[in-house]
């Protein structure tokens, strides 16, 4: 327990919060260009080929971001929008690419949770 005098000389300093998505620099989303589109495998108990892309952002950061949904039309030099949100079983992947925005199309024939995958409302039969 410090004395009052010690606190007057050197006050308590609150710990600074560290961002979980530093490349966004407090913005909700950021635009970037794909430098590499590839698949990678998840951590131990899971098994799959997860689609990811290395993206060079407008602020100069280069990040790995996840492409959600079934199928995509991304290739090198595609312009994409990224948002925060990590993928728990892919180390180093701390961002998601927004579906249905800029060069990335929405998921085809998606019926539920459409807004998360940039899919338009299907025509009523």
Curated annotation (Swiss-Prot):
CDD domains for the chain: Ribosomal_S12
GO biological process: translation
Gene that this sequence comes from: rpsL
Function statement: With S4 and S5 plays an important role in translational accuracy. Interacts with and stabilizes bases of the 16S rRNA that are involved in tRNA selection in the A site and with the mRNA backbone. Located at the interface of the 30S and 50S subunits, it traverses the body of the 30S subunit contacting proteins on the other side and probably holding the rRNA structure together. The combined cluster of proteins S8, S12 and S17 appears to hold together the shoulder and platform of the 30S subunit.
Source lineage: Bacteria, Pseudomonadati, Pseudomonadota, Betaproteobacteria, Burkholderiales
Membrane-spanning intervals of the chain: none
Entry's family note: Belongs to the universal ribosomal protein uS12 family.
Gene Ontology molecular function terms on file: rRNA binding; structural constituent of ribosome; tRNA binding
Name the record gives this protein: Small ribosomal subunit protein uS12
Cellular component annotations (GO), alphabetically ordered: small ribosomal subunit
Top-rank lineage group of the source organism: Bacteria
Entry keyword set: Methylation, Ribonucleoprotein, Ribosomal protein, RNA-binding, rRNA-binding, tRNA-binding
PROSITE patterns xref list: RIBOSOMAL_S12 (PS00055)
Assembly, per entry: Part of the 30S ribosomal subunit. Contacts proteins S8 and S17. May interact with IF1 in the 30S initiation complex.
Sequence positions bearing 3-methylthioaspartic acid: 89
InterPro entries: NA-bd_OB-fold, Ribosomal_uS12, Ribosomal_uS12_bac
A Pfam cross-reference name: Ribosom_S12_S23
């Amino acid at each position: 327990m410090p004395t009052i005098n010690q606190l007057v000389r050197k006050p308590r300093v609150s710990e600074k919060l560290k961002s979980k998505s530093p490349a966004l620099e407090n913005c909700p989303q950021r635009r970037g260009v794909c430098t590499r589109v590839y698949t990678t495998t998840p951590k131990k108990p899971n098994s799959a080929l997860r689609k990811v892309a290395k993206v060079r952002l407008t602020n100069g950061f280069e990040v790995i971001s996840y492409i959600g949904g079934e199928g995509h039309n991304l290739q090198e030099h595609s312009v994409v929008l990224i948002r925060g949100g990590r993928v728990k079983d892919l180390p180093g992947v701390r961002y998601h690419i927004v579906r249905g925005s800029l060069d990335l199309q929405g998921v085809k024939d998606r019926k539920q949770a459409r807004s998360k995958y940039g899919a338009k409302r299907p025509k009523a039969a």
